Amino acid sequence: MFDFASYHRAATLADAINLLADNPQAKLLAGGTDVLIQLHHHNDRYRHIVDIHNLAELRGITLAEDGSLRIGSATTFTQLIEDSITQRHLPALCAAASSIAGPQIRNVATYGGNICNGATSADSATPTLIYDAKLEIHSPRGVRFVPINGFHTGPGKVSLEHDEILVAFHFPPQPKEHVGSAHFKYAMRDAMDISTIGCAAHCRLDNGNFSELRLAFGVAAPTPIRCQHAEQTAQNAPLNLQTLEAISESVLQDVAPRSSWRASKEFRLHLIQTMTKKVISEAVAAAGGKLQ
């Protein structure tokens, strides 16, 4: 039995915001895959709970007429994987969701929880970065929209105040032609394991050149990151193996991995360069291009 000091089930989003404001120690419970572990270990910081699991305002995937997408923060990873909209418009996000844990976890774990947990290994963070998502955040002070790039502020930390709730992810319209994206995860096991290194890439091609490249890595720095030096190297560069090699060298200026029991810093640097080539090659192929 969990040792709750207080438990409140929010009836609406407004109710949840008020409950958070009235309970400064409260933690949100959506999927529960992180919070319940803390409760199991009797973490005193998780004894006050506001349950938002059943809030309709936090769920659903919608496509607007202009091609922009909205994904509710409490949407589960299984829902992301199975939805035709995300399959068509955000394939790297679907691939990342498919790499998370196992079916039982994906059935309950939420997209928003994975991002707000703040872990650099969060598998959904890198595709969210390459698709330039904005986060819709509600609080007693109103609504604000912030870019995903910069939302992670340190290990286990995000730019979210206690009385704020991440309500939805908003994705800008994606070009329909000559674009491709991919996600790749390296872990010690094929399933039920967190990333040793994770990455995602999105590219737009134009007449045999990189018109744009977006590259993101997880577990390559204290937070999930976009790789600015690598992206600049690709800008308007020819679509060939020499450019790919140059990008894999430039990416070393963007990353700062550490050694841990999972992998040494040196091995992670090797993985980063190797995975840069792999994920970009897959994104180029998805865009209909070929590296010569």
Curated annotation (Swiss-Prot):
What the entry lists under InterPro entries is as follows:
CO_DH_flav_C, CO_DH_flav_C_dom_sf, Diverse_Substr_Oxidored, FAD-bd_PCMH, FAD-bd_PCMH-like_sf, FAD-bd_PCMH_sub1, FAD-bd_PCMH_sub2, Mopterin_DH_FAD-bd
Its GO biological process terms? hypoxanthine catabolic process; purine ribonucleoside salvage
Reactions mediated catalytically: xanthine + NAD(+) + H2O = urate + NADH + H(+); hypoxanthine + NAD(+) + H2O = xanthine + NADH + H(+)
**Which Pfam families is this protein grouped with?**
CO_deh_flav_C, FAD_binding_5
Check the record and name the Gene3D superfamilies matching this protein: 3.30.465.10, CO dehydrogenase flavoprotein, C-terminal domain, Uridine Diphospho-n-acetylenolpyruvylglucosamine Reductase, domain 2
UniProt-annotated binding residues for FAD: 27-34, 109-113, 165, 184
Keywords assigned by UniProt, alphabetized: FAD, Flavoprotein, NAD, Oxidoreductase, Purine metabolism, Purine salvage
Enzyme Commission (EC) number:
1.17.1.4
From the UniProt record, give the pathway where this protein acts. Answer: Purine metabolism; hypoxanthine degradation; urate from hypoxanthine: step 1/2; Purine metabolism; hypoxanthine degradation; urate from hypoxanthine: step 2/2
Residues covered by the FAD-binding PCMH-type domain:
1-176
Which cysteine pairs are joined by S-S bonds?
none
EC category:
oxidoreductase
Listed PROSITE patterns: FAD_PCMH
Cofactor(s) listed in the protein's UniProt record: FAD
GO CC annotation, single: xanthine dehydrogenase complex
Q: Which GO terms describe its molecular function?
A: FAD binding; xanthine dehydrogenase activity
Describe its partners and assembly state: Heterotrimer of XdhA, XdhB and XdhC.
What role is this protein assigned?
A: Presumed to be a dehydrogenase, but possibly an oxidase. Participates in limited purine salvage (requires aspartate) but does not support aerobic growth on purines as the sole carbon source (purine catabolism).
Name of the protein in question = Xanthine dehydrogenase FAD-binding subunit
Gene, per the UniProt record: xdhB
